[in-house]
Amino acid sequence: MAQYGNQDQMRKTDEYGNHVQETGVYQGTGTGGMMGGTGTGGMMGGTGGEYGTQGMGTGTHHHEGQQQLRRSDSSSSSEDDGEGGRRKKGLKEKIMEKMPGQHEGEYGQTTGEEKKGMMDKIKDKIPGMH
């Protein structure tokens, strides 16, 4: 199929059919016909074929400077040390935490205080409810 009109007025498109704005100076011509024509040229590169098309480069994408966020499904890396602070868990503790069932040598809070329930915490915040 022959191309009609002035080639300078033709719109360029990328590999997805989106219009591409031309910037800068470019050289190259496309020639072709119904059979056996070749095409060369373009801003970044050309393709040759039956009808002579002008190419706009390759479709490879490199995202430099962007890092992919990776998350593991591991548990928390620290726990309460029983003295109001936090301490780092070891590998054994993380593995034991994931395993089902009772854990005999578990670390935990060793204070003798009674834990407050949700209602007790709310009542403590409301003035005059003591």
Swiss-Prot record:
Record keywords: Stress response
Skewed-composition ranges (Basic and acidic residues): 61-73, 92-130
Tagged with keyword Cytoplasm: no
Protein induction: By abscisic acid (ABA) and salt stress.
Top-level taxonomic group: Eukaryota
Stretches the record annotates as Disordered: 1-130
Keyword Cell inner membrane attributed: no
InterPro entries to which the protein is assigned, alphabetical: Dehydrin, Dehydrin_CS
A biological process from GO: response to water deprivation
Membership in a protein family: Belongs to the plant dehydrin family.
Name of the protein described by the UniProt record: Abscisic acid and environmental stress-inducible protein TAS14
Phylogenetic lineage: Eukaryota, Viridiplantae, Streptophyta, Embryophyta, Tracheophyta
Designated gene of the protein: TAS14
